[in-house]
């Protein structure tokens, strides 16, 4: 058969893909058991999409465009995307919600982990460790037992110039280069 016979349209007007999709070959036999959720593209035009977080109460999906310095929001009710839901976003990366429904974001620009309060104000949860600034807070999660916020701080982001502000953080840098 010619390659055109297998061509699929994954563009904005494409129909949702349903599982099991015969064109997707899973290496792990458990993959088909993931369910029959359709794959849909809701937005085009993000420079670097990161940190998707679902808000079950508000019924919306939030994500970050790091170099675009914005957060976007897709709402289930109307299916629309709000550009610049939060702008500027501090070059936010990872996002999550705490058990009170407040948004937690890891910011590359100011190198902070923050929480957006109900009234729109911002609370800084962490911005340094042992007197040294962070590298680039990346992803966060809320611990299921005690509600504490756990986050990663890899040795990139603020140390690179991609986001326009190369920094000397003073934070510990990774020394192991090979996979462990």
Protein language model features and the residues they cover:
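Sequence-structural signature of mature extracellular/luminal beta-sheet repeat domains
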Residues: 2-180
């Amino acid at each position: 058969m010619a390659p055109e016979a297998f061509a699929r349209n994954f563009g904005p007007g494409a129909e949702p893909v349903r599982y099991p999709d015969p064109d997707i070959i899973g290496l792990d036999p458990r993959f088909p058991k993931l369910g029959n959720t359709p794959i849909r593209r809701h937005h085009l035009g993000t420079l670097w999409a990161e940190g998707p977080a679902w808000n079950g109460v508000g019924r919306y999906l939030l994500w970050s465009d790091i170099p675009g310095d914005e957060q976007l929001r897709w709402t289930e009710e109307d299916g629309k995307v709000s550009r610049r839901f939060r702008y500027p976003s501090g070059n936010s990366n990872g996002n999550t919600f705490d058990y009170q429904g407040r948004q937690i974001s890891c910011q590359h620009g100011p190198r902070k982990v923050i929480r957006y309060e109900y009234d729109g104000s911002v609370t800084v949860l962490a911005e340094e460790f042992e007197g040294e600034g962070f590298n680039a807070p990346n992803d966060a999660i809320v611990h299921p037992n005690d509600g504490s916020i756990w986050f990663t701080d890899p040795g990139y982001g603020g140390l690179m110039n991609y986001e326009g502000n190369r920094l000397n953080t003073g934070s510990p840098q990774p020394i192991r280069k090979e996979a462990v």
